[in-house]
Amino acid sequence: MKHLIRLCTVLCTALWAYSVQAQELDLRDSTRYLALIDSSFNAGNKGDYSGAESFLKKAIELIPQHPTNIYLLNNLGGVQQLLGKKEDALDSYSKALKRQPDNATTRFNRARLYALTGKHNAAVTDYSLLIAKAPSNELYLYQRAMSYMLMRQYDLAEHDLKTIVEHNGESLKARLGYGLLETARGRYNEAERIFDYLVTKLSTNADVYEGRARLYLARRMKGYALRDMEKAFELSKGKPSPTLLRLRAEINEGLGDKHSAEKDLRHAEELEKHYLN
């Protein structure tokens, strides 16, 4: 389960580094601390996210200054996302970053959650800090470009996509971003050219068909949009993203199928409790 990272070497190293200090602590607290961490993993692996959250909180509260708490707070944020507690998750990530500002994993997790909750200014700030440390990281640049695009700061979005291409001229991810950007700008002919090219290169990629469906919907070509949407669902193999469901809901609403639209919206809302975009 990707949201519950068994801290592996990092956790073991942190625990070892703390062992000298632990000698000054009550041995029972140290033993209980480790037991609570183990219980949190066991609960999470069984799908008991409320239990995992409770065990992690108890471990952090038991020894508040333990250096491993940085990683436990990141895990706590992931568990809280799975529970749909997005604001609590943001608070957990922020507490972890206050202790270790350079932790890229936690900052990326917070940036994605900011974007998921529509807080794109905050997301851009986190992505910018990540990019300052890794200027050519394609994932960071792409995600910041998408936040810029949703903020209608199209020139800044284009700049990030251009940076990706400068470092990787064959990047299909950047081309997908350009297709979405040109659609948002209303440059539909250029967007269609990009998506048609991507379909030939990434014929089994659901994101490409979802992107072209957005284009067709913007051009009021609902039949074509629905065709690409169904292809995207087929390629998602029963695991559609919330954005895919919301887009199909929008298409079905436009076609007058309100029942299907409402069903997809409910499904999207349920998935968003657990989803990182």
Where are each of the predicted segments found?
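N-terminal leader/linker segments that initiate helical-solenoid repeat arrays
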Residues: 20-73
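Register position in tetratricopeptide repeats
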Residues: 45-46, 82, 116-117, 150-151, ...
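Short coil turns that delineate tetratricopeptide repeat
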Residues: 64-67, 101, 135, 169, ...
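TPR alpha-solenoid repeat register
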Residues: 69-72, 106, 140, 174, ...
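Canonical tetratricopeptide repeat
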Residues: 71-75, 109, 143-146, 150, ...
